[in-house]
Amino acid sequence: MTKKKAHKPGSATIAQNKRARFEYAIEEEFEAGLSLQGWEVKSLRAGKANISDSYVTFRDGEAYLFGATVSPLNVASSHVVCDPTRTRKLLLKKRELDSLLGRVNRDGYTVVALSMYWKNAWAKIKIGVAKGKKEHDKRDDIKDREWQTAKSRIMKHANR
C-alpha cells in the first residue's frame, strides 16, 4: 500500500493560516525565507507544519517566527533533540525589516504568518502586516460573504 500524501503533489503550499484573514485586516504582505534545521525541512516536505497561532516578533533588529509548530518525523529525527515550537529566524531584506519594524512600533500593527509554501527548493513564509478586526467588522465580512454566495445562486438560476 502507498502512503497518503500530506498535500497535493502539484501544490507548493505547506500550511495556511485561514484564521488570520478572519481575525485581522491584512494591510500588506511580504515573502520571507526561513532559517531551518535539517529535520524541519524533512518534516515540511511531509506536510507536518501548523502556523495557525504563529506571529512575528522583533529582537535585536531581526525578525523571528513564534508559535509555528513543525512536528518531527520519527525516522528523520532519531539522533537529534527536536523542539517542534522553537523560534525560527526570518530572512528578510533590510528595507523590508525596517518597514515592518516601523509599522509595528508606530502604528499599532502586528505581523502574522499567512501561509508557508515551497518556492523552488526553498521554504518560504508569507507574512502580513495586520490590524485586529472588531467584532462588528467580522460580522460584516460574514454578511458580505453570504450575500455573494446568495447572489451567485440567484444569478445561476436566473440564467436558466
Curated annotation (Swiss-Prot):
State where composition is biased (Basic and acidic residues). Answer: 138-148
Q: Which GO terms describe its biological process?
A: trans-translation
Q: Name one GO molecular function term.
A: RNA binding
Keyword list, A-Z: Cytoplasm, RNA-binding
- Tell me which InterPro entries the record gives: SmpB, SsrA-bd_prot, SsrA-bd_prot_CS
Q: Kindly give the PANTHER family that the UniProt entry links to this protein.
A: SSRA-BINDING PROTEIN, TMRNA-BINDING COMPONENT OF TRANS-TRANSLATION TAGGING COMPLEX
Name the protein family. Belongs to the SmpB family.
Tell me the function of this protein: Required for rescue of stalled ribosomes mediated by trans-translation. Binds to transfer-messenger RNA (tmRNA), required for stable association of tmRNA with ribosomes. tmRNA and SmpB together mimic tRNA shape, replacing the anticodon stem-loop with SmpB. tmRNA is encoded by the ssrA gene; the 2 termini fold to resemble tRNA(Ala) and it encodes a 'tag peptide', a short internal open reading frame. During trans-translation Ala-aminoacylated tmRNA acts like a tRNA, entering the A-site of stalled ribosomes, displacing the stalled mRNA.
Q: What is this protein called?
A: SsrA-binding protein
Gene source species = Serratia proteamaculans (strain 568)
Gene name tied to this protein: smpB
